């Protein structure tokens, strides 16, 4: 049965990702920045905004004579494949904790790809140059979710989780949110009959996410301080006023989001 579950997850994930991003393989796409990046892929700009994995990947590509814009369709094929693998890892990791009807399992298979195939993710993917640099982040995200939910050795679980998360948010910081949502869901399912264990693991996951996020910010601050990179003007800050402003913005947005998906859906469809 596990073999068929895995196959179903793989096939459905493949169909969803190909439906969402297959068009990016058929022909080249260009963003506002693409033409500039043909001549200068700007690795250190990626470092300035905390995407150190992207920076390293671009530097390596430059040494190998690879251009992320010119070879965008090749990398898009790899990105779609790794996205399917990542989604399978996340889905299987959560499904192992589920003791529910088969219908719920298939709903999970359909739901998890929506974190990566939606209007917000598609907006990112229209920047064709992102295909190459998102590949390691995608794989690391899937591994981070699976190791927390499936690894039994505590020290190994948390060590690998930190490593995978550092790689993942070094590719794209928003991955931290996807990680937290799916891992907290998996923890609830795995230990729903053991509140103490559930809460301790939940706080552990939130703590790891916080530490890795702070690491990302501090690394950029240190490099800027020592003149190794320029200040992007878009960097995160530890100023209390800014943090409170961001929290208020997130809370205010919830009203619009749950009412009509910020204007995308009909009123009051989201709660349903």
Language-model-derived ranges and their functions:
Residues 141-158, 192:
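Membrane-interface transmembrane helices that cradle and orient dolichyl/undecaprenyl
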Residues 1-18:
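Start-transfer (signal-anchor) and selected internal transmembrane alpha helices
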Residues 6-8, 42-46, 100-110, 154-158, ...:
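Membrane-interfacial loop-to-transmembrane alpha-helix junctions, especially the N-terminal start
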Residues 28-71, 206-272:
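Membrane-lumen/periplasm interface segments of multi-pass, membrane-embedded glycan/lipid transferases
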Residues 77-101, 143-146:
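Transmembrane-helix motifs of polytopic, lipid-linked glycan transferases
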Residues 47, 51, 103-149, 170-171, ...:
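Membrane-interface micro-motifs in multi-pass membrane enzymes
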Residues 178-211:
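Perimembrane helix-loop-helix junctions
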Residues 25-31, 61-65, 92-95, 116-127, ...:
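Juxtamembrane "helix-exit" motif on the non-cytosolic side of transmembrane helices
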